[in-house]
């Protein structure tokens, strides 16, 4: 699979937890969307816990980086997948969080994830400056990838409402639905904060063919500075 190496934003995937289950207790995990890497990994983690800890039953349901912090804090789950900067914002009530969520704790740091932005190989879109009237699919509300997108286009001087006013569409849907929209030509851009490589992008590379959108150094320098927790990264050409 050919990929252009370009500047991207990455963050560490980690698990956050509230109180851990005791014996004869049900342990609930909120992970990621179907089609992403978090959901199958979350299912495996829960399987291992259930077989290794006597008296514990488990479940794994889909979620998003922002909503998972809220679910754990609110007692709807005991363990949730998120990103380092997302849970830090949630704990302190910053960013997309309207209040502080103090009933969360770090449980484990797993691996870095990249915010990836792809267009069809024949697209005229060369950068974020060309997306002001595009049909984009950045993820669902309360997903960290959606927040990534908003922070980037904010630096370019527009937002989701601007896109809509200009005749574009913001599809807030799942990875699976985003892939279908890209294949049908109903979405011009697919964005996701996920592992590298990732199944949805591999599927789109096979058909209809895609290329990735990066950020110029001066732009990414400013975005990283303005968003604590963001770090630099590149998609390897061999990925």
Regions found by a protein language model. Give the residues of each.
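Bacterial N-terminal signal peptides that target proteins for export
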Residues: 1-8
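Cleavable N-terminal signal peptides
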Residues: 8-11, 20-21
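N-terminal signal peptide c-region/cleavage motif recognized by signal peptidases
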Residues: 16-18
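Extracytoplasmic
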Residues: 24, 53-55, 64-67, 74, ...
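Bilobed "Venus flytrap"/periplasmic-binding protein-like clamshell domains
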Residues: 24-57, 113-184
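Pocket-flanking alpha-helical
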Residues: 43-47, 59-99, 176-181, 196-205, ...
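Pocket-lining segment of extracytoplasmic ligand-binding domains
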Residues: 84, 94-95, 123, 159-239
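A structural signal for short loop-to-beta-strand junctions that line the ligand-binding cleft
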Residues: 98-110, 238-239
């Amino acid at each position: 699979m050919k990929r252009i190496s370009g500047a991207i934003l990455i963050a560490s995937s980690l698990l956050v937890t509230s109180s851990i289950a005791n014996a004869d207790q049900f342990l609930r995990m909120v992970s990621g969307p179907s089609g992403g890497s978090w959901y199958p990994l979350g299912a495996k983690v829960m399987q291992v816990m259930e077989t290794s800890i006597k008296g514990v039953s488990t479940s794994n349901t889909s979620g998003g980086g922002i909503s998972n912090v809220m679910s754990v804090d609110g007692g709807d789950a005991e363990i949730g997948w998120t990103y380092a900067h997302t849970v830090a914002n949630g704990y302190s009530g910053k960013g997309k969080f309207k209040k502080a969520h103090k009933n969360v704790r770090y449980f484990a740091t797993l691996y870095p994830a990249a915010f990836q932005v792809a267009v069809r190989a024949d697209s005229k879109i060369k950068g974020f400056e060309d997306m002001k009237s595009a049909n984009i699919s950045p993820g669902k509300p309360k997903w960290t990838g959606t927040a990534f997108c908003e922070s980037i286009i904010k630096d370019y001087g527009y937002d989701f409402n601007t896109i809509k006013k200009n005749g574009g569409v913001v599809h807030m849907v799942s990875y699976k639905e985003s892939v279908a929209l890209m294949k049908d030509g109903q979405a011009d851009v697919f964005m996701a904060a996920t592992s590298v490589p990732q199944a949805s992008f591999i599927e789109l590379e096979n058909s209809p063919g895609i290329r990735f959108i990066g950020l110029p150094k001066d732009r990414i320098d400013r975005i990283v500075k303005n968003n604590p927790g963001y770090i630099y990264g590149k998609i390897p050409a061999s990925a």
